[in-house]
């Protein structure tokens, strides 16, 4: 039977404490999802905490699968350079493959996106295919699987039909 339990964290050092997460496993088999999702994040943000911290956390988790989902915010950048974006993605995916060598790596491309702003819509139309191509190429180069979520939604502009049906 499920019981309610209380978790208390106390600082024993007297300094600033930053809790990055908690691992509360039941001991029963199942799927553990550990997300570092940040609303508005871009691909470069995954490197911000520092590689050594990421390596330690991935080592403790010992994941069977690492899923990386980026591109939706990146494609809204007016200064996006596809070659630099692909190089950054390739570097990050290469590091993840090294940091979790036993894990399969899955990269999901961005969902189709639209904007009420004409300027942003033009920017997305220009950047979306480049971001998807860069992520696909970087994933393949890192030995990762790639899923094109925009194609699964129905392709370019499909988000509008999803929105009309109140699905997006």
Model segments located where?
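Conserved SGNH/GDSL esterase-like catalytic core that processes O-acyl groups on lipids
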Residues: 1-94, 114-116, 165-167
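Loop/turn elements at helix/coil->beta-strand transitions in domains of secreted/extracellular proteins
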Residues: 31, 61-66, 100-105, 141-145
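Catalytic His-Asp segment of secreted/periplasmic serine-dependent ester chemistry enzymes
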Residues: 51, 112-168
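Alpha/beta-hydrolase-fold catalytic nucleophile elbow
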Residues: 69, 108-109
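Secondary-structure boundary motif
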Residues: 98, 102, 154-155
């Amino acid at each position: 039977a499920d019981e309610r339990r209380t978790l208390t964290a106390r600082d024993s050092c007297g300094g600033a404490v930053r809790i990055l997460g908690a691992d509360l496993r039941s001991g029963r088999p199942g799927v553990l999802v550990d997300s570092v999702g940040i609303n508005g994040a871009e691909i470069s943000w995954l490197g911000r905490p520092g590689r050594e911290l990421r390596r330690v956390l991935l080592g403790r988790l010992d994941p069977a699968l690492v899923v990386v989902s980026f591109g939706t915010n990146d494609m809204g950048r007016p200064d996006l350079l596809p070659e630099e974006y692909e190089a950054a993605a390739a570097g990050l995916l290469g590091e993840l493959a090294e940091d979790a060598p036993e894990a399969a790596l899955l990269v999901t491309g961005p969902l189709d996106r639209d904007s009420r702003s004409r300027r942003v819509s033009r920017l997305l139309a220009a950047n979306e295919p480049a971001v998807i191509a860069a992520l696909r190429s970087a994933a393949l180069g890192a030995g990762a699987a790639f899923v094109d979520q925009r194609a699964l939604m129905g392709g370019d502009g499909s988000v509008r039909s999803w929105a009309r049906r109140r699905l997006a």
